[in-house]
Amino acid sequence: MSSSTIKTLAVAVTLLHLTRLALSTCPAACHCPLEAPKCAPGVGLVRDGCGCCKVCAKQLNEDCSKTQPCDHTKGLECNFGASSTALKGICRAQSEGRPCEYNSRIYQNGESFQPNCKHQCTCIDGAVGCIPLCPQELSLPNLGCPNPRLVKVSGQCCEEWVCDEDSIKDSLDDQDDLLGFDASEVELTRNNELIAIGKGSSLKRLPVFGTEPRVLYNPLHAHGQKCIVQTTSWSQCSKSCGTGISTRVTNDNSECRLVKETRICEVRPCGQPVYSSLKKGKKCSKTKKSPEPVRFTYAGCSSVKKYRPKYCGSCVDGRCCTPLQTRTVKMRFRCEDGEMFSKNVMMIQSCKCNYNCPHPNEASFRLYSLFNDIHKFRD
């Protein structure tokens, strides 16, 4: 091979390398679309690797790059393999993420799946979180709709609301004091559902809701209608130790739509000494405060600020300690690549110890199914 040919090949390789580097660098100025892209159900918006534009986060086993990052909130990262110059990689779960079990199947950390046509679920470090694919079934029907009911539509998975136009419309003001409950609502209670119908179009309160409903007039609601605002209590934490998930259902929003809210919770750190801190003669240690400020972690990201949270302790007589009073704090998290997001986090104020334990023995707890939910969690 002649020297001129070798030089030509060397120049070509150099130009190719420079081209790849140029494509992988960030622009001097950001130019983003006026409207954020619309993502598939369960897919969130994240900033690209240059910190410029919001893009739909890539999911497990999808191609990724600097401009198409993976979904950090699900514990995914872009794996470029052994190549240091690769421009594209594949979204993989971080190694520390734990798999999930659902319906006798194992799903990897960061994996998304549909257990049925009405839910889209994702495994996040041992916990399964789901979003509804039929939101119209969860929303409250128009309060001017007499005797509304959900009906199946041929060829569709989701049911739709229909109204009984032949019924006489009663005045809402005359029905505000007709709140009640009957046995037919037991199944709805089990499913954490809220419904605003009944005989004579009376508005009813289900016992799953811990507080009395309040009627609000909000000009943002459709046609300026009244909204019966109801919110369930937060469910118990999905894990007895370590980071878990707590949920509740509410329609306290501008559209009066029934939505599920989640928050991160930690009853106690895993590996917390059980009996070493008990005083002489004491059988329980109700509440313990972190000895030093710590950062909360979620999906491989850490809280921006440090906190000194309280945790629930343990007992030696078979009782278990669970949160009694809590509050919810919106917390900012930062990932290693600079991506930031906010999550609601449970902060314990006090704990109680009794024999009404969510599972027989916290020390031997391995598998826990969250009541009123379709999820399973594994430590």
Swiss-Prot record:
It comes from the Eukaryota. Disulfide bonds join C26-C50, C30-C52, C32-C53, C39-C56, C64-C78, C70-C91, C284-C321, C301-C335, C312-C351, C315-C353, C320-C357. GO terms for cellular component: cytosol; extracellular matrix; extracellular space; membrane. GO terms for biological process: apoptotic process; apoptotic process involved in heart morphogenesis; atrial septum morphogenesis; atrioventricular valve morphogenesis; cell adhesion; cell-cell adhesion; cellular response to angiotensin; cellular response to hypoxia. It is found in: Secreted. Belongs to the CCN family. Promotes cell proliferation, chemotaxis, angiogenesis and cell adhesion. Appears to play a role in wound healing by up-regulating, in skin fibroblasts, the expression of a number of genes involved in angiogenesis, inflammation and matrix remodeling including VEGA-A, VEGA-C, MMP1, MMP3, TIMP1, uPA, PAI-1 and integrins alpha-3 and alpha-5. CCN1-mediated gene regulation is dependent on heparin-binding. Down-regulates the expression of alpha-1 and alpha-2 subunits of collagen type-1. PANTHER family: CCN FAMILY MEMBER 1, CONNECTIVE TISSUE GROWTH FACTOR-RELATED. This is CCN family member 1. It comes from Rattus norvegicus (Rat). The gene is Ccn1.
